[in-house]
Amino acid sequence: MAAMECRDKAVVPPRRLVQARLPFKRLNPVPKEKHDAEAEGKKGKCSKSGLGQSKDSSTDTLHASTDNMENDCQLNSDVNFVPKLVNGKGPLDHFIQKSTKDNTDEIIVIIDSVDESNQRLSDDVDHVSFDSKASSAALTNGMLGKDMNKLSCLNSTQNSQTDDSMQTDVPCEAIANKGEDLVDGIQSCSGLTERNNLENTKVNQSELKDVIFEGKMPVVLLEDIMAAKSPQVTSLDGSVTSENETVELSHEGDSVLTNSSLSSLSVSSPEAQPVAETKRNTSPLAVSTPVRKVSQKLHKSSAEKEKLRLQRDQERADKLQKLQAEREEKGRLKEEAKAAKERAKEEAKKKKEEEKELKERERREKKEKEEKEKAEKLRVKEEKRKERQEALEAKLEEKRKKEEEKRLKEEEKRINAQKAEITRFFQKPKTPQAPKILAGSCGKFAPFEIKENMVLAPLCRIALYPDFLEQLDRLLRAQNSEVSFLRDLKCRKPRKTGPTFVNSSTDTVNSDVVVVDNCKTDAVPERGKFGRMKLLQFCENHRPAYWGTWNKKTTMIRPRNPWSKDSKLLDYEVDSDEEWEEEEPGESLSHSEGDDEEEGEDEDDDDGFFIPHGYLSEDEGVTEECDPENQKVRQKLKAKEWDELMAKGKRLHVLQPVKIGCIWESAQNDSGTNADLKILQQFTACILDSSVAEEEQQIQKCSKKRAKDQQILGQLLPLLHGNVNGSKVIIQEFQECCRQGLFSDVTAATDCGDTSPVSPNTSRPQTPVGEDSGVPSKARLKRIISENSVYEKRPEYRMCWYVHSEVLKSFDQEHLPVPCQWNYITQVPSSGKEDGGSVPGVAPVQSTPVSVKRKSTGSMCITKFMKRPRDAEQAEAMEMDGFQADTEEDEDDDDCMIVDVQPCKDSTLTVTETAPESRGTTAAHQDASMVSPSNTV
């Protein structure tokens, strides 16, 4: 049994303590003598049935969980715990009322009933075989009434000890030994009472089996039968004293076991089987011992047992208190540990949160720091960029200022060069001044300036001949102290040399006139005067190579030291290649002037004066310190002129100056002198006398001119006033009318008058217009129109020509209609018709063909071969709103045409018109296909 408890302790958890229910008596008890036999029989049956039922239920309850045990036990107790009444008696009545009164001192029956599940009983019954003989002996020999109170107290202490033994670590071996002692005592007692109770057991066995274990309510029955012990087993008395400590009927007192059942329980365990076999072998000895001896020993040891029992009770109480204190201490420690664990958990959580917050703060601070550093870096970078930008802008501004200054200087130099180029022909060339040379090696004399036409005299004027030098050497070798050199000097006559003359080579170079005798036409200046031409060129330089003369000589650079530097002659710190800048192309002065200069150029070409490219005059060879750029501009202009002349293929010849000396009157008859006189006569000065007649003629001419203008204006008023066309159309129409003789008065007036002067602003006329033909010039008509009328917009009509009111009044032409009603004889542009509008009374346009015989080919109007767009004329007419339509300059430009008549293979005309740039028209080239057959040559 003890071994079983050791095995079940690990499986079944500790149970809570339940107060034991003490046995009670019925109010109407049945006599004990009547039911002794029935009790013995029922007890035997109960043990067998309990054993069988416990074996079946043990397998199910072992696997049940601890939570479902109490529920199952409570369910079973509610349903099946109601025992069947036999003759109005329950199962407890059979145990309380016993008929064995003779052996009351020897047998002690203990009944313990606790309200608990029968799981513990099922576990115990699996290991116990119920002995019906032992149980019947216990019932017959038991004495219940005498020791009921004592046994109940003992039973309660045993139950408490059993509960304590489940929670404490009692060795399984001690419990097993105690169980073996208890088995021996029970077996001896069962042997004494076997014969007496055999019949009662058989009678009541069936009833006890049905009553006791019905509903699985176990009752524990213990019998202390130490009196039946034999003398041979007296050595086991020590173990009997502790039998009450180890015997356990049930976990809470719900099972019923006898001493024989405990013996069978201990025998069924593996540890107690050998001991049980030995006891069985010795059981006949125990049965054969007298009962009186056993009872005497039991009486003797009862006092000792009582003391031991009290001592054990005290120990158990102390142990219970100690266990209770330990349990409370454990609970308190557990609570403290739990509280400490909770605190540690809270602290860990708090610490973790603090660490997390700290990390978050550090991360935020780090991020803010990085952002600040980044912002600082960006600010520094932006400041640096701004500084660089400002420095770059300052540098660019400085560079721009320098370029502006340089451009202004170059512009000023260019203007000065142009002025100098123009005025160079009217100024006398300056003679180059000789460089200032200071003579500082003249002994006691102070340094002085060597002026022009001056040279230094030689230090020694005496010419040392070889004979004199030999004599000097001889005298030096044969020196005599007696001979005095001073005496020789006094006796010697002084030597003489010629005067010092200025080098004549400078005169030939700097002379203004060079007489060339028998010079060829294509001769080139002599190179001996200027030195050899040299080319200084380096492949790694951007600066153009130098091709010219280099007459400077150095005393520092020699063949033995070619890498030495001559700082006096050259400046090694300045890199001329870096200072080189590509110059802009200069303006060509050859075509800057008007067409009037072309005639002058043709006349200048006849002079035969030409300077070849690369030729340096006397004044050009000298570098001016004040204006070094002027010479470059001149050279560029001369180079361009040279290229232009070479392109034209003009002949080059060297100028031959002529010197004519004085001519005497006596030598006039000489043929050579007469030729010179003819040359000089063209430059003869003439005395001119001013006369009054010329002024009067000029006044008369002006008066005639004004009168003629008035006559022309009188005939022009009907055509001019209210005309929407331009001045060009009006002038063309008026001239055509004059050619056809429509204005007889004007023609007659022009015939008797002088020729009208041509305006200086007019260029070549389109047709040869003059007084011989009776047609006024275009410039004259244009001047008259501009002086007496204006092209503007008025309420009467839109844009047209309006003659001044005073002019109309002076000619009595105030009634002229607006627009004009003129019958045109020439072709008028369509824009004029549209501008004029369809006014009733206007005659249709009449296009009278002009005979080719009356006009030369050069006098034909080029506009006949052109078709100007209608929109262009309308745009021109609308743009002149509020302003004078045409000016003299505009009309002159319009009429400035170059008509080139070239004979072709097909005998056709090729007409080219060059329109001025001011009107924005393009040149029109007409093929022969656009010329009518009548105009062919």
UniProtKB/Swiss-Prot annotation:
Protein's UniProt keywords contain Chaperone: yes
Compositionally biased intervals (Polar residues): 59-69, 756-766
Biased composition (Basic and acidic residues): 31-43, 301-386
Its job: Acts as a component of the histone chaperone complex chromatin assembly factor 1 (CAF-1), which assembles histone octamers onto DNA during replication and repair. CAF-1 performs the first step of the nucleosome assembly process, bringing newly synthesized histones H3 and H4 to replicating DNA; histones H2A/H2B can bind to this chromatin precursor subsequent to DNA replication to complete the histone octamer.
Motif (PxVxL motif): 213-226
TM region(s), chain numbering: none
Record keywords, A-Z: Cell cycle, Chaperone, Chromatin regulator, DNA damage, DNA repair, DNA replication, Nucleus
Subunit structure: Subunit of the CAF-1 complex that contains RBBP4, CHAF1B and CHAF1A. Interacts with CHAF1B, PCNA and RBBP4.
Phylogenetic classification of the source organism: Eukaryota, Metazoa, Chordata, Craniata, Vertebrata
Low complexity composition bias: residue spans: 255-269
Similarity annotation: Belongs to the CHAF1A family.
Name of the protein this chain belongs to: Chromatin assembly factor 1 subunit A
Compositional bias segments (type: Acidic residues): 574-586, 594-608
Main location group: nucleus
Disrupted-gene phenotype: Cells lacking CHAF1A show delayed S-phase progression with retarded DNA synthesis and defects in a rapid nucleosome formation of newly replicated DNA.
Protein's gene: CHAF1A
Domain of life: Eukaryota
